[in-house]
C-alpha cells in the first residue's frame, strides 16, 4: 500500500539525501487502525506485526526521533534531523484526529540515552528550548503525549528495545 500517497505533507521534511529517514509504511490498502510511531525501532516491529491480518498497520516514524509532541531528538552535532520532529507531530495529530486509529504503538531505540547528559543524543523541548534538564523534559514530553492520546480514546503501547548485554 502506498503510504506516501496518503501523506504527501511528509515529503520535504527530511533532507533530500536522507529521504530514507522518513519511514512511512502501510500494511495494506484501506484505513489503518494501528499506528506505529517513534524511530527506526519500528522498522523491526512492522514486519512481525504485519502478519496479523485482523489489523491494518501504519508506520509513521523518523530516524532518531522520539515519539513525543514538540520534542526534537538529535545527535549533538547533527543538523540534518532538525525538522524531523515535524514528522512526529504530524503522525501524532493524525492518530488523535482519526477515529479509526484505535492503538498507538510508541517506540524509541535510545530512550534511556535521552536522560543521560553524556550520551551523543540530546533532546530539546521546543516549547521551552532554554530547558536543559533532560530527565524533566523526557517526563513532561512523555506525559503530555500520553495525555493527548488517552484523551482521544487511544490505547497506547510503549515498546522498549532489549537491553544491551555488556560482554564480548
Predicted regions and their residues:
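Extracellular/periplasmic envelope-modification machinery, especially enzymes
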Residues: 1-168
Amino acid at each position: 500500500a502506498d503510504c506516501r500517497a496518503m501523506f504527501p505533507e511528509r515529503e520535504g521534511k527530511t533532507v533530500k539525501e536522507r529521504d530514507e529517514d522518513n519511514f512511512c509504511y502501510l500494511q495494506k490498502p484501506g484505513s489503518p487502525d494501528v499506528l506505529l510511531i517513534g524511530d527506526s525501532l519500528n522498522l523491526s516491529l512492522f514486519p512481525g506485526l504485519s502478519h496479523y491480518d485482523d489489523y491494518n498497520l501504519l508506520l509513521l516514524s523518523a530516524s532518531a526521533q522520539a515519539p513525543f509532541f514538540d520534542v526534537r531528538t538529535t545527535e549533538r552535532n547533527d543538523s540534518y534531523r532538525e525538522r524531523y520532529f515535524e514528522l512526529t507531530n504530524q503522525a501524532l495529530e493524525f492518530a488523535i484526529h482519526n477515529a479509526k486509529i484505535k492503538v498507538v504503538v510508541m517506540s524509541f531505540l535510545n530512550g534511556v540515552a535521552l536522560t543521560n547528559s553524556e550520551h551523543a543524543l540530546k533532546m530539546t523541548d521546543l516549547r521551552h528550548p532554554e530547558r536543559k534538564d533532560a530527565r524533566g523534559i523526557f517526563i513532561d514530553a512523555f506525559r503530555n503525549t500520553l495525555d493527548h492520546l488517552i484523551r482521544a480514546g487511544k490505547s497506547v503501547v510503549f515498546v522498549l528495545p532489549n537491553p544491551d548485554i555488556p560482554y564480548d
